[in-house]
A protein has these predicted regions:
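Residue-level detector of transmembrane insertion/anchoring sites
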Residues: 14-17, 131
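Beta-strand-enriched, solvent-exposed domains that form extended recognition/catalytic surfaces
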Residues: 33-133
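Short helix-terminating capping/connector loops at secondary-structure junctions
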Residues: 68-70, 181-182, 216, 241-243
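C-terminal cap/substrate-recognition subdomain and adjoining C-terminal extension
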Residues: 197-294
Length: 294
């Protein structure tokens, strides 16, 4: 009897060991099956025909206090259903694709998460402007397209979001569409100092706002770095060969001054309050007058 009890103890221990092992494997399998939900953000890009361009993307996990970059994840750049480039996210969630377009115009690109055991499938879209460098370019301050904000700023930030989204100014979309239909390419410019995603989120919000309100497609530039950011960007564009950018349509005094300091023409719309108009800047009381000023 004692011998049989002693003989049973190893068997019981074995069963417990097997059971614990199965539970561990089960828990591990469940943990591995739970993937993180990521959010993809992509910035617009500008280039010429058959010229390589960097497409910037960012994969994040949204949090209550801050967003966390998801590193080490495979991303794919897709055009018309075909994978044209691949990249891996760094520790901050950023990835950069190199892509050479072979057709002029506005191209829609998709960035998506590739095969990953850690992150669910996600995708985001962006616009790639492939322009002829001889075509005139019109720079438009996004704030000049919107109804007046409740908070003033030297360079108006983009006030988008569920609680603060602004309506477009009357006739702005129609008039800008007429300007871009046969003659101008358009660059939309805004300042986003408080964007914790380094401009990625603001770029996406502007793109959605412009599409919702039927503005013509164009290249979106999100700037940060204070009042001098626009001037530096204009210099970079000219140095990069985009010398046909000679006209601007803006709302703020700082926007107008950046153009005038470089001997570029600028139209302010709508008509500003007294004292806010820089010398040599043209004024349009509304968007229906803008074409007469260019």
């Amino acid at each position: 009897m004692i011998a049989s009890v002693r003989g049973a103890r190893p068997a019981v221990r074995t069963r417990w060991a097997v059971l614990l092992l199965l539970l561990h494997v089960s828990e591990t399998s469940v943990w591995c099956a739970d993937k993180v939900t990521g959010t993809l953000l992509v910035k617009d890009a500008l280039t010429g025909l058959n010229q390589s361009v960097a497409i910037e993307a960012k994969l994040i996990r949204k949090g209550l206090l801050s967003d966390v970059g998801l590193g080490g994840e495979p991303l794919e750049l897709v055009q018309k259903g075909e994978i044209v480039a691949k990249a891996m996210t760094g520790g901050d969630g950023r990835a950069v694709f190199q892509f050479t377009p072979n057709m002029r115009g506005m191209a829609t690109l998709t960035v998506r998460v590739g095969e990953s055991p850690r992150v669910d499938r996600a995708e985001a879209m962006a616009n790639l402007a492939v322009w002829e460098r001889r075509t005139p370019i019109l720079a438009v301050e996004v704030a000049a397209l919107m109804e007046e904000a409740t908070v003033s700023s030297p360079l108006p930030l983009l006030p988008l979001g569920e609680k603060t989204e602004r309506s477009p100014l009357p006739a702005a979309a129609d008039e800008l569409s007429k300007l871009t239909q046969f003659y101008y390419n358009v660059i939309y410019i805004t300042i986003a100092e408080s964007d914790r995603s380094d401009g990625f989120m603001t770029n996406e919000q502007i793109r959605a706002w412009l599409k919702t309100h039927k503005f013509p497609p164009g290249h979106i530039l999100v700037l940060s770095g204070g009042p001098d950011a626009l001037g530096r960007q204009l210099d970079e564009l000219h140095t990069g060969g985009w010398k046909t950018l000679k006209f601007g349509i803006g709302r703020s005094k700082a926007f107008a001054e950046a153009f005038l300091q470089r001997r570029l023409e600028v139209v302010i719309v709508p008509e500003p309050t007294k004292g806010e108009l820089p010398r040599k800047a043209k004024v349009a009381k509304d968007w229906k007058e803008v074409r007469k000023k260019l």
